[in-house]
Amino acid sequence: MAKRVSLPDVVISAPKAVFKPAKEEALACILPKYYKSMADVSIKTNSVIDKCWFCNQDLVFRPISIETYKGGEVGYFCSKICRDSLASMVKSHVALREEPKISLLPLVFYEDKEKVINTINLLRDKDGVYGSCYFKENSQIIDISLRSLL
């Protein structure tokens, strides 16, 4: 059996197993000398707060945002469908807190945009909705399949 040792003068305020130093932001791009940078631009995010970033409808109530991995928020959306649809498009560029549950194509894909907007408005207040859309190449049709377990 191990012998217990008491050290009254030692204070452990932040043990290495618990304390993780805050890392600075990673460098965006490091190129070897034989590459030449063709574009290096920094642009602020969209500042529009009165329209949904996905369906462009007016926001008449408190907007929903995409939650980032570090606790921040980005975007303004009228519904969870719009938020998750845009989040599924940008998840390779923005570190998200959680995986999106819904994935629709951008409205530019649809011939009848009003049908998609009506679906968004119909399901705006529903919880537990998940699903996606499927593009049928032969018939040039997009099937939207949204489901709920509730």
Swiss-Prot record:
A GO MF term: zinc ion binding
Keyword annotations: Activator, Late protein, Transcription, Transcription regulation
InterPro entries per record: Poxvirus_VLTF2, Znf_MYM
UniProt keyword annotation of Transcription present: yes
Transcription regulation is among the record's keywords: yes
Pfam families for the chain: Pox_TAA1, zf-FCS
Subunit structure: Interacts with itself. Interacts with the late transcription factors VLTF-1/OPG093.
Job of this protein: Acts with RNA polymerase to initiate transcription from late gene promoters.
Family (UniProt): Belongs to the orthopoxvirus VLTF-2/OPG126 family.
Protein name per the record: Viral late gene transcription factor 2
Organism: Vaccinia virus (strain Copenhagen) (VACV)
Gene, per the UniProt record: OPG126
